[in-house]
Amino acid sequence: MGLTTAAALPFGGVVLIVIAFQLALALGAPWGSYAMGGAFPGRFPARMRVAAVVQAGLLGLVAAIVLASANVVFQMLDPELRWLIWLPVVVSAAAVVLNLITPSAGERRIWVPVSLVLLASSLLVALTA
């Protein structure tokens, strides 16, 4: 297994966990204090449940870009689309910053390490793919 694949697989696995978390929020799990800055402790209201589903979908798209860039799935990124790998890097970097500044201590404890793993692995794929 090459370095690019070795970086992409943890990204995909971690994103699956985050997607599961988002879908659990959408289904009513009482974990609102660990998302969205802790603004909705307990169960998300209806509009935030919809937002959680949208976030899960976007995370799936970001994971597909990383995995395709590493030729783990699809193997569809022709040279003209190679720049797409920088989108997950930017999204992951933004997640690190937002999770560092969140007012929710629980959210910081959980999601800063997760977003750092996503940033490191997506950056490694971007630099080696």
Positions of predicted regions on the chain:
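Interfacial loop at the N-terminal end of multi-pass membrane proteins
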Residues: 2-8, 28-52, 73
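Non-cytosolic membrane-interface motifs at loop->transmembrane helix junctions
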Residues: 4-8, 38-39, 75-83, 106-115
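Hydrophobic alpha-helical transmembrane segments of polytopic
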Residues: 7, 11-18, 48-58, 84-91, ...
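N-terminal signal-anchor/start-transfer transmembrane helix
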Residues: 13-33
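Hydrophobic core of alpha-helical transmembrane segments in multi-pass integral membrane proteins
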Residues: 54-67, 119-123
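Mid-chain, well-packed structural core segment of small domains
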Residues: 61-98
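Juxtamembrane boundary at the C-terminal end of a transmembrane helix
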Residues: 68-72, 122-129
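Membrane-helix boundary connector in multi-pass membrane proteins
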Residues: 94-110, 126-129
